[in-house]
Amino acid sequence: MIALGIEGTAHTLGIGIVTENKVLANVFDTLKTEKGGIHPKEAAEHHAKLLKPLLRKALEEAGVSMEDIDVIAFSQGPGLGPALRVVATAARALAIKYNKPIVGVNHCIAHVEITKMFGVKDPVGLYVSGGNTQVLALEGGRYRVFGETLDIGIGNALDVFARELGLGFPGGPKIEKLALKGEKYIELPYAVKGMDLSFSGLLTEAIRKYKSGKYRVEDLAYSFQETAFAALVEVTERALAHTEKEEVVLVGGVAANNRLREMLRIMAEDRGVKFFVPPYDLCRDNGAMIAYTGLRMYKAGIKFKLEETIVKQKFRTDEVEVVW
């Protein structure tokens, strides 16, 4: 079976075409903004403009036509309302035109589900991106969020800090590069509250220290990463201890960070659990993960009526009963 997936929860429009065990195409285009940050209306306009050419490109790359597609999946949420609506409308139009079944997919669940294409069975997932920071795992037939940010996502925190340092957007890779030259750890607020995280205090203090002019930016970048990532690893380790699962996966755009990968790998080795990071194009927001999750849902008998395809800006992972 072949599934087409459309992702458009934020500033990236992605279209993926997959079978049960192979990615046939995975193309995307990301809205570039001067100062970073995303305006929902601009994201929607970007997606609307690029949907047709990107769909054409995906079909060409996969070597298939719309007639060959068995099911159409789309990112139903969580995300920016205007952007989600563009994607849902396109998915509905294609489903009606080509008489195909349609499935709405939870974006956060898809990030973890795509790892199963690579043999991962039942992991704890650390999902880190601009807008999201969650530790989630399957328990009792639903993806439960064991810990999450109480304020801003880790990717957002890195971007804002980079912007304050005059590094531009996206800031994550630039902070990572700068951190490699750090020589000294500077004390910054470490906020783990129960199983949840907070990055706003860390961000505020790091900016304050930078503006004081008393610290090397390399040391601040290094200390920012070490503090934030240690908190992420701590909460992930607690979730592993609680669930007694034997696999941990790292997904989302910030999964590109080599220091975060290294810290998680060390923790996984210490606990004797398997650690996996998908190829980067399947870590970031992408259509292939939506297609793959949608295909698994469809094969398990999940079918959506058109009126059930309404977008959900605040779509929680535990709203979805996982029967696939």
From Swiss-Prot:
Binds 1 Fe(2+) ion per subunit. One of its GO terms (molecular function) is iron ion binding. Its EC number is 2.3.1.234. Its cofactor is Fe(2+). The keyword tRNA processing applies. It comes from the Archaea. GO terms for biological process: tRNA threonylcarbamoyladenosine modification. It is found in: Cytoplasm. Substrate binds at residues 127-131, 159, 172, 176, 257. Pfam families: TsaD. InterPro entries: ATPase_NBD (IPR043129), Gcp-like_dom (IPR000905), KAE1/TsaD (IPR017861), Kae1_archaea_euk (IPR034680), Peptidase_M22_CS (IPR017860). Keywords: Acyltransferase, Cytoplasm, Iron, Metal-binding, Transferase, tRNA processing. Monomer. Component of the KEOPS complex that consists of Kae1, Bud32, Cgi121 and Pcc1; the whole complex dimerizes. Belongs to the KAE1 / TsaD family. This is tRNA N6-adenosine threonylcarbamoyltransferase.
